[in-house]
Amino acid sequence: MRVSQFFLATLKEAPAEAELISHRLMLRAGLIKRLGSGLYTWMPLGLRILHKIEHIIREEMNNSGALELLMPAVHPAELWQETGRWDVFGPQMLKIQDRHKHDFCFGPTHEEVIVDIARREIKSYRQLPINFYQIQTKFRDEIRPRFGVMRAREFIMKDAYSFHADVDSLEQTYRLMQETYSRIFTRIGLKFRAVAADTGAIGGSGSHEFHVLADSGEDAIAFCPASDYAANIELAEAVPHGIPRKEPAGIMAKIATPDRKSCQDVADFLGIPVEQTLKALAVTAGGKFYLLLLRGDHQLNETKVRKIPFLGDFEFAEESRIIAEMSCPPGYLGPVGVKAEIIADRAVLEMSDFTCGANEEGFHLSHVNFGRDLPLPDQVFDIRNIVAGDPSPDGKGVLEICRGIEVGHVFQLRTKYSEKMKATYLDESGQTRIMEMGCYGIGVSRIVAAAIEQNYDERGIIFPQTIAPFQLSIIPVGYHKSQQVRTEAEKLYQACRSAGIEVLLDDREERPGVMFADQELIGIPHRIVIGERNLREGMVEYQGRLDKTPQMLSLSEAASIISKICGD
């Protein structure tokens, strides 16, 4: 491809609203153009990258035995009403009416549609298992679209759905999809981790996320360097350190702590470690009032709390309810002498001589101990976020925390949708059974941004070779002034094309600095510079995008050498 025949629309500066480096670089490199809030046009350069990612995904999905189809983007409301999600999915679902006043939505996901296909077409166990997938544009009405294509309203997704006669078959395909996803992300050239995750709004019984590791990631991931353990911080088990609770070292005393409400403020005021303080959070569930206890330096994990059956619908208590129950405003709550049911985190049981609220405004209690000053908590659960240094749940070391960008998610849905929509089959004995189901998603357009978050420098993008828009750029210095430069550049260009190399010849009448800057910005991994001086010695200059210095190649061997480099 010649630049003169291509649409290269680079910018020197990114628009002010671009926050993430990937958003800034995608706009500057001309990969995307903004149409409206959360809406982007994929320009020719960006589309080449998308197509390469889609090609890798299709190859690996097809190799796994999955079958590609394409479902409508617009769904009738009746399907979503069958599962109950029409009313509960939330404002992210964009709902519309046709001219006949019939309700539809732009599909944010396709469980209902694929189950409708399965219940119509699959009748016998002989047709199972089967795995369908599509690559399609989806729409979610994000309340605050941001970060470019990372959180856009319209995005491209690969979603797959499998149907099974039993759980064993589902688990086999689930493992196969995990392996397939690992191959996809490895081929793309991403550094990633597969982590155990919460099923969220999709539901089901098992779930794993695939995260591209990046400091800008929205999600926190807990992992153990000494093993394969990894989990989203929402799900990672906080294992107690196993330290026996010490005997009391002091007498409980009430201390004035004026205007000190947070554990950190109290710790600073009293000159004690914050981990020696205890926080009490007031919540309600099922109309009942509870106190949740955590160590002062730990954070509540709401996902874990909601998994406790009697706290599934918990809410933080209103101040009026707190005062009615505790005769004390928030900020000074504690577990001593209260009637409320006490739910404690595991780490609380290891505490002794701790400081907590005195249930009196402006006061805290110090040197508080279980068994002496108050009974043990009514119930104990894991209700906190893990912190770096916690024991790994697999017993093989300690946990570290990194940031990640979610690019894939797999679920064991079981019968969550198939039962509600009556997707059944006849088993070997002629009995009617409900199909087991799995679903598997990849954020195709999000991968482009995630890859950039991992691969960039001060000059621009450094795409992995497998998804770079072009493998090689040829920059002829003096193309419009020197016949020799033009001739040799054209020869090398044609030789590279014949060798199957995706090459971009910069035949613009531009300064070399502009051409170099554009090539580095858009992330082409290899570059050949042709100039009169080097041609006199039969040489051209080669430099990889990550190389600090260029090297000279023989003009006669340049095409074959580049072909080998690009093939590695």
Swiss-Prot record:
Main localization (coarse): cytoplasm
Subcellular location: Cytoplasm
Keyword terms: Aminoacyl-tRNA synthetase, ATP-binding, Cytoplasm, Ligase, Nucleotide-binding, Protein biosynthesis
Gene3D superfamilies for this protein: Anticodon-binding domain, Bira Bifunctional Protein, Domain 2, YbaK/aminoacyl-tRNA synthetase-associated domain
Top EC class of this enzyme: ligase
Protein origin, superkingdom: Bacteria
UniProt-listed PROSITE patterns: AA_TRNA_LIGASE_II
GO MF assignments: aminoacyl-tRNA deacylase activity; ATP binding; proline-tRNA ligase activity
GO cellular component: cytosol
Gene Ontology process terms (BP): prolyl-tRNA aminoacylation
Pfam families: HGTP_anticodon (PF03129), tRNA-synt_2b (PF00587), tRNA_edit (PF04073)
E.C. number: 6.1.1.15
Catalytic activity entry: tRNA(Pro) + L-proline + ATP = L-prolyl-tRNA(Pro) + AMP + diphosphate
Complexes and interactors: Homodimer.
Role played: Catalyzes the attachment of proline to tRNA(Pro) in a two-step reaction: proline is first activated by ATP to form Pro-AMP and then transferred to the acceptor end of tRNA(Pro). As ProRS can inadvertently accommodate and process non-cognate amino acids such as alanine and cysteine, to avoid such errors it has two additional distinct editing activities against alanine. One activity is designated as 'pretransfer' editing and involves the tRNA(Pro)-independent hydrolysis of activated Ala-AMP.
Protein family (similarity comment): Belongs to the class-II aminoacyl-tRNA synthetase family. ProS type 1 subfamily.
Domain note: Consists of three domains: the N-terminal catalytic domain, the editing domain and the C-terminal anticodon-binding domain.
Stored HAMAP family: Pro_tRNA_synth_type1
Full protein name: Proline--tRNA ligase
Organism (species): Nitrosomonas europaea (strain ATCC 19718 / CIP 103999 / KCTC 2705 / NBRC 14298)
Gene designation: proS
